[in-house]
């Protein structure tokens, strides 16, 4: 009999404990309305040289989307449990996520001055019939391009050939002085008694200076 009472008491305690920790799940969907921010940023770049000046203006629009930082769930569900020994209530949990999305749109505006292009092509006037090897040459101008802001420089090349020139040079030598050295070696030869002949052995050295 005592064992039956103890078993019944344990069974009642176990059912009470299980009732305390039992719960239910309720699904709830909440739509969050996002907000956005539009931030324009303008940038201007300029270019200038001797004949041209223009500006490049660009505007970048940045759009940021933001979800709400808080959410309210109105249909909160609760579940009441009761047993012989305990009772409780269940409060559902809610979560939300914040998402930020940026959209960049670029607009490029390029403004240039109006320009007019001219492309003439003609033959240059012939040169005069003077002593020149190029008198029959045909010189054609390069294509030209000009704008309202200035002209484009044009380069022409002309080949000139010189006539051969002959020059005569007269060379007059300076007056020169020549010296002659005579060296004699006297000797006496007797051909016969009473006759004596004299003669010289002479060498001439000629030196010339300019």
Curated annotation (Swiss-Prot):
Keywords: Cell wall, Cell wall biogenesis/degradation, Glycoprotein, Secreted, Signal. It comes from the Eukaryota. It is found in: Secreted, Cell wall; Cell surface. Residues 118-127 have a biased composition (Low complexity). Residues 80-99, 118-142 are annotated as: Disordered. Residues 132-141 have a biased composition (Basic and acidic residues). Glycans are attached at residues 23, 174, 200, 206. GO terms for biological process: fungal-type cell wall organization; nucleobase-containing compound metabolic process. One of its GO terms (cellular component) is cell periphery. Residues 1-19 form the signal peptide. Required to stabilize the cell wall in the absence of multiple GPI-anchored mannoproteins. This is Cell wall protein SRL1. It comes from Saccharomyces cerevisiae (strain ATCC 204508 / S288c) (Baker's yeast). The lineage of its organism: Eukaryota, Fungi, Dikarya, Ascomycota, Saccharomycotina.
